[in-house]
Swiss-Prot record:
GO terms for molecular function: DNA-binding transcription repressor activity, RNA polymerase II-specific; RNA polymerase II cis-regulatory region sequence-specific DNA binding; sequence-specific DNA binding. Residues 116-175 bind DNA. The keyword Cell membrane does not apply. Its main location: nucleus. PROSITE patterns: HOMEOBOX_1, HOMEOBOX_2. Branchial arches, molar and incisor teeth and limbs. The lineage of its organism: Eukaryota, Metazoa, Chordata, Craniata, Vertebrata. Residues 44-70, 175-194 are annotated as: Disordered. Keywords: Developmental protein, DNA-binding, Homeobox, Nucleus. It holds the Pfam family Homeodomain. It is found in: Nucleus. May play a role in determining the production of hemoglobin S. May act as a repressor. During embryonic development, plays a role in palatogenesis. This is Homeobox protein DLX-4.
Amino acid sequence: MTSLPCPLPDRGASNVVFPDLAPALSVVAAYPLGLSPGTAASPDLSYSQSYGHPRSYSHPGPATPGDSYLPRQQQLVAPSQPFHRPAEHPQELEAESEKLALSLVPSQQQSLTRKLRKPRTIYSSLQLQHLNQRFQHTQYLALPERAQLAAQLGLTQTQVKIWFQNKRSKYKKLLKQSSGEPEEDFSGRPPSLSPHSPALPFIWGLPKADTLPSSGYDNSHFGAWYQHRSPDVLALPQMM
């Protein structure tokens, strides 16, 4: 028997047997050997692949050496989950708020006192003369008298009232200093009645020690009185 050469399948028969491979084979046959449609369409890809920079990377190679750290730094700075600060204890927050309030209170008080403090009134010599004369006449002014005096001197009623109050307090202090309370004297002398009165003597005419009766005299006198009594008088308590 003689073997007949097997005829090559027709292109139409291959399409029937392998319908999916037919378009690929037709496309490959249209380009030269070793080139794909992608490589033939973009000749720059072969150049980039030769240097190890495939087009599949989303970020191209850095232009300078310092820029190579930027992508990793961006990933570290912007993590997937946001950073949450640990919650502090509510009691600590209240304590801090109280400390802050206490630290602000003295400064506020100082500012208020500075704002409320009024300038000191300066009286002229003529005004002081009239005020002193009126104070010698009377230490307390009624409301009409105060208004009249304030109008005469060109002052307010409050200024006249405050001046009289200060003058009364000074006058009382002077009286206390002039009278002076008796201080304790440890020298053995009693305090004097007034600063100008003479000192009283320490001994007030007391009898001397030699004139005082002795204890022996008292005993002898009592013994003599006991001897002169009758026995009947002495026996009365026993009979009762």
